Amino acid sequence: MSYAIFRGVALAICAAPLVVACGGGNAGNPGPINSTQCSGASCGVQGPPTSGAGSGSSSGTTAGALCPATGDIVKSTYLGGAGSGEVVSLNIDAQAMTYTLKWLESPIPLHTGTVTPSRAGVQITGAVAHPPTGALPTAEQIRCAFILTPGSGTASVDGSTYSTAASFNQANPPMILVGLGVAGGGIPGATVEFDGLSIPLAGSGIGAVKNRHFDFYPFLGFASTTTDISKLPGTYNGLLYHLVPSGNYQTIATNASETFDASGNCTSSSTVPAGGSASSTGCLTTGTAWTANTSGYFDSQQAPQILPQFSKPIVGPSGKSGTAHMVLGQINGATVPLVVRTGFINLGTAPLYLDAKIDDESGIALLAKATAIASGGFDGGYVGADSNFKYTASLIQGTTGSFISPSTSQLEEPAFTLNYGLSTPGLIGVTDSNGKTGYAIASGGLYAIAIQGEENGGLTSTSANSDTPNTPYFGVGAQISK
């Protein structure tokens, strides 16, 4: 099995504290990663973890630990969302080296070649594996990284056995980096394909979805969440990333400013992307008022669309049938809403399928309170995953940010600049070295970035087709150093 990517992720994790704190450079020009150049506490975790952190023999976390004590990791079930438009719960037992993952909401077909049913409701179990000794620079990083090897479970909708073995790519597998209060990385991917419908007089291949494999889907989950709607009210900046499979996987990244009241209603005056359709109150993340789901998150019907929708022969688009789901994360004293849009398809009745509902736009959004952030206000190193289907690391230092290559631990490309002077509090302007622009937001030790350009090395070839565009770019990360 290839562990090059895990070595790269770990080096990137090391890079964040080392290059800034230990004189190895800055975010615009980081020096080579060399753990021996550091000394003292400024270098963070070094060598094997202490017994409290690594053995699981005591509860709590040791100072400098990247994740809970080994015996305590199982105590947290991470509830979150994926870029696929899925709501997922994940539990890892770091002593038994097993995991349990359940798709609570999903637009991803249960079987390749179909569009329904989805894998919503499927729970799988499998083994986790740490990268081997020596694959990561420190024992602490190895302890907190978990590869989700192929898992399986029974799909109650049709009684079939669902397995992730077919989608597992040894060179770029789903992997979770467990942190303190948060877990991120990638959940099992899938291969998506649909030949389309044959409709009399209209032809065949109607609504076809081209075959595309996804090594994993970027995921962010919280150890602590709430369904207390009183935690939500306020004005938030949001960064959204959606795609439409029936539109040849057309993607979009955009921003929104939205205000929520104590009843879960949303209002906004954000610009609606061309071809999109906001809610009746102008929102891009939220349709109807948020209502609590018994599984620990919120639902909103008639989810807005930010991409053009599939148009059926004779009758045209079928309107909004997708659903939005919000996970209210509680982390580092902040409430951080994570919203996924789950597309919906019902093929309707043959032979004309006039009653079909095809709203397959799905995606993810991170929201952050619209509170002013000064330069340096979210400095640090962040790790996560992005729209390139890569595990990533970013360095933020004042007005400069950098993407670090997982394979070389060097700059992926010239640094991007950050503009803290925008009129919207908490919304930070981003400009890359080619003049492509976008935005960044941050809250509770999490950050999201969206740029209208090709960034961070472009798409991973095993998760893209030959005509898949490398733009726009979207990434989410959790802070692991300051």
Task: List the model feature ranges, each with a label.
Residues M1-A10:
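Bacterial N-terminal signal peptides that target proteins for export
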Residues L11-A12, A16:
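Non-catalytic peripheral regions of nucleotide-handling enzymes
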Residues L18-A21:
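C-terminal motif of bacterial Sec signal peptides marking the signal peptidase cleavage site
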Residues G23-K482:
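Mature soluble binding/inhibitory domains
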